[in-house]
C-alpha cells in the first residue's frame, strides 16, 4: 500500500512539473493587447491627436506665455478667466505634451520590436520603417515645443528608466539630428494601404512619405532659424542643408 501511495505521489509530482509550463499561459489575459499587437501607426495617431486636437491647452499656453506677456492680445479681447493662472500650462506639461511624446516614442519602439520579432506582414515590413521615421519627425516637433515652453528636456525619456535632463543646446542638436536622419531614411516608394492612410490625423497627408519628408525638412529649416541669434553658423548650416531636400512650398 505504501508503495502504491508513493507511486501516486510521484506521478502527481511529475504531472505538476509538466503543468508548470502552462502557468504563464494561464496568467495571460486573452483580451489584453500586448505591444506585439499594437500597430505603430495607432500610437502615432494617438500622439498627434493628443497634441493637435485639444486647443484648450496648447493654444492657451501660447497665448498666456507669449501673446499676453507681450500685450499682443488686449485684456478684454480674449477669455480672461485663468489668464494668469498656470493651470493650463500645467495641463499642457502633463498629461498633454508628455503623453504625446510618450506615444510617439511607443510608435518608434513598437516598430523596432515587431521587426525584430518578425511578426509583421510583407507590406508592414516595408511600411513600418517609414512609420518609425514619421514618429521621429513628430517627436522632434513635440520636443521643440517642450524645450521652448518649459526648458531642458530629457532626451532618453519614456524608455523605461528615470532619465537625466539634457541642456537646451543638446536638445536642439538632437532635434535637428533626428529630423535630418529621419527625412533621409524615409522610403518614398513605399505607400500605405487605405486603412493605414486613414490613421494619419492630417487628412491631406495620410502617411504620404513624400509629404512627411517635406515636413521634416521644412521643420528643420524653421527650427534652425531659432538658433540664429545664438549659434549663427549652425543655424545657417542646418538651414541650407535642409533647404536642399524636399520641402513645403505650397499649401497642399
Give a label for each model feature.
Residues 1-28:
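Bacterial Sec-dependent N-terminal signal peptides
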Residues 5, 32, 120:
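Sparse, context-dependent recognition of short Cys/His-centered cofactor- or disulfide-binding micro-motifs
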Residues 20-77, 83, 87:
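Membrane-proximal, proline-rich intrinsically disordered regions
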Residues 37-38, 73-252:
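Structured, solvent-exposed acidic/aromatic patches
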Amino acid at each position: 500500500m505504501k508503495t502504491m501511495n508513493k507511486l501516486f505521489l510521484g506521478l502527481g509530482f511529475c504531472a505538476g512539473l509538466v503543468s508548470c509550463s502552462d502557468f504563464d499561459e494561464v496568467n495571460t489575459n486573452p483580451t489584453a493587447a500586448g505591444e506585439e499587437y499594437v500597430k505603430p501607426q495607432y500610437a502615432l495617431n494617438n500622439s498627434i491627436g493628443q497634441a493637435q486636437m485639444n486647443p484648450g491647452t496648447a493654444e492657451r499656453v501660447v497665448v498666456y506665455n507669449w501673446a499676453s506677456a507681450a500685450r499682443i492680445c488686449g485684456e478684454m479681447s480674449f477669455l480672461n478667466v485663468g489668464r494668469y493662472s498656470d493651470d493650463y500650462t500645467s495641463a499642457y506639461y502633463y498629461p498633454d505634451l508628455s503623453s504625446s511624446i510618450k506615444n510617439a516614442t511607443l510608435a518608434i519602439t513598437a516598430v523596432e520590436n515587431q521587426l525584430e520579432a518578425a511578426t509583421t506582414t510583407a507590406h508592414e515590413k516595408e511600411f513600418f520603417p517609414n512609420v518609425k521615421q514619421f514618429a521621429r519627425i513628430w517627436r522632434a516637433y513635440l520636443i521643440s515645443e517642450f524645450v521652448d515652453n518649459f526648458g531642458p528636456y530629457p532626451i532618453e525619456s519614456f524608455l523605461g528608466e528615470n532619465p537625466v535632463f539634457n541642456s537646451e543646446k543638446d536638445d536642439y542638436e538632437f532635434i535637428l539630428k533626428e529630423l535630418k536622419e529621419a527625412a533621409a531614411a524615409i522610403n518614398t516608394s513605399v505607400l500605405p494601404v487605405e486603412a493605414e492612410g486613414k490613421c494619419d490625423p492630417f487628412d491631406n497627408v495620410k502617411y504620404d512619405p513624400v509629404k512627411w519628408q517635406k515636413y521634416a525638412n521644412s521643420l528643420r529649416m524653421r527650427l534652425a532659424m531659432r538658433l540664429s541669434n545664438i549659434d549663427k553658423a549652425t543655424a545657417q548650416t542646418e538651414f541650407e542643408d535642409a533647404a536642399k531636400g524636399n520641402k513645403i512650398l505650397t499649401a497642399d
